[in-house]
Curated annotation (Swiss-Prot):
Protein's UniProt keywords contain Signal: yes
Signal peptide residues on this chain, from the entry's feature table: 1-20
Cellular component, GO annotation: virion component
Pfam families per the UniProt record, alphabetical: DUF5859
Phylogenetic lineage: Viruses, Varidnaviria, Bamfordvirae, Nucleocytoviricota, Megaviricetes
Superkingdom of origin: Viruses
Name of the protein in its database record: Uncharacterized protein L274
Subcellular location(s) per record: Virion
Keywords: Signal, Virion
InterPro entries: DUF5859 (IPR043849)
Length: 212
């Protein structure tokens, strides 16, 4: 049985999912984030679904571990609760996502110079752990499925292979309020999904003005 630890499983959250067999856009061949600063309103235009719903959340996550070949469920983890905030800061021209997950680093999300909506609108660096606890450095690219949800893929900065796919669904009126997040991690050998995390985040407070 693979050695599972809560610290490895919940190493990173936002993370922020959904890419099938269609030809990959040229941007996916890149493993860097240009970190282009945007204004408070500019980030909202670039990533409208998340831009309308920045603020403070309390989240509850559950996770199932799967056999990446047979898809059988191997382990179901107990519910894990943490706080999360995604807030715009003038100092970087970006969103900073901070959680209370032990060991989780601050994620700084920038506009990537491409249109939002149906294309990739933002990017950031993030570290994900596999089931053995090995950290994998990734770059995350976000896009909006217009009027539906926010989609993110995370590719390895070393190999450009898909590591994690994440979908974020706003549940409130006008897509402001609580969020449901689905995270899928891919086994580096078989390329099948080896764990799935479902997260429900309750909105505590909106961010109405940028922070310094």
């Amino acid at each position: 049985m693979k050695n599972l630890t809560i610290g490895a499983i919940f190493l990173i959250f936002f993370a922020v999912s959904a890419f099938a067999s269609a030809p990959c856009p040229k941007k996916l061949a890149d493993t860097t984030c240009p970190r282009e600063p945007y204004s408070f309103e500019g980030m909202k235009r670039q990533e409208p679904i998340k831009g309308r719903n920045v603020g403070w959340f309390q989240c509850q996550a559950t996770m199932t571990v799967h056999d990446p070949v047979t898809t059988a469920v191997l382990v179901t983890q107990p519910t894990f609760t943490f706080n999360l905030s995604t807030l715009y800061h003038n100092s970087c021209g970006c969103w900073k996502t901070v959680t209370t997950i032990p060991g989780d680093a601050v994620k700084m999300e920038y506009g990537n110079g491409l249109p939002g909506q149906a294309m990739y609108g933002s990017c950031f660096y993030a570290t994900w752990a596999d089931l053995a606890g090995n950290p994998v450095e990734t770059v995350g690219f976000a896009r909006n499925v217009v009027g539906v949800h926010r989609d993110l893929i995370y590719v390895s900065r070393a190999t450009n292979e898909l590591v994690v796919h994440q979908s974020i669904y706003p549940l409130g009126r006008d897509q402001v309020g609580d969020e449901y997040v689905l995270v899928r991690h891919f086994d580096p050998v078989t390329k099948g999904i080896d764990w799935v995390q479902a997260v429900y985040c309750t909105k505590i407070q909106d961010q109405l003005e940028p922070l310094p």
